[in-house]
Amino acid sequence: MGYDKLEQNLIDIIKEEQAKLGFFTEDIRLYYPLSSLNHFFSAQDNTDEMQIRLDSLPDSITEKLGQIHVSHKGDRFCFHIPKEGTVYVHDNTAPNEFIHNLVELVGKHGCTMNEILNLFHTYSQNVITKKMDNGEFDLLIRFADKPEDTYYYCFKDEGCHIIYHRFLPDDYTDFNF
């Protein structure tokens, strides 16, 4: 189960990167804190235990994403995904239309929070919003009824543009926003 969650998250992040930057046949590096990896596996591994867990990824992942090299410095883990992995995601998975549209919208000059909320509502009428006053973000939006998208999307209006970051539910809870 944990490896399935890890695989899906790696693919989700690669899709998001491709929506933001375009598709390139190149290696990429994705970084995770130990706490996020422990959430995937419902574990409380220390860094050495997690490194051992990740040193031999299952064939179900490597057959798709290639021979991923995992290393860490402190509690920050780096997943070095070979170009075969980015090509696989591009060629063999459906694009995430919502992420593509969100990236396009927030990249537009003059984008508003209302436009972002309207975009969410085009994908579901069951959307949860929460105003945030933590200095980091202004608004949380998430889908209440989309098991394929459990992310918490946090937005910050920086005056001239809006930025966002998406968190897995457990990671969002860890931040204690």
Predicted regions and their residues:
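Intrinsically disordered, low-complexity regulatory segments enriched in Ser/Thr/Pro
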Residues: P147-F177
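A cross-family detector of function-defining hotspots
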Residues: T112-F155
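Charged low-complexity interaction tracts in eukaryotic proteins
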Residues: S60-N92, I162
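Short helix/turn-capping signatures at newly exposed starts of structured segments
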Residues: N92-N126, F167, T173-N176
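Short glycine-rich, basic-tinged beta-strand/loop micro-motifs
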Residues: F23-Q44, N96-V106
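Charge-enriched amphipathic alpha-helical scaffolds
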Residues: I28, N38-H69
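Alpha-helix boundary/N-cap detector
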Residues: M1-N9, Y32, D45, E49-I52, ...
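Positively charged, polyanion-binding regions of nucleic-acid-associated proteins
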Residues: G2-R29, L102-E104
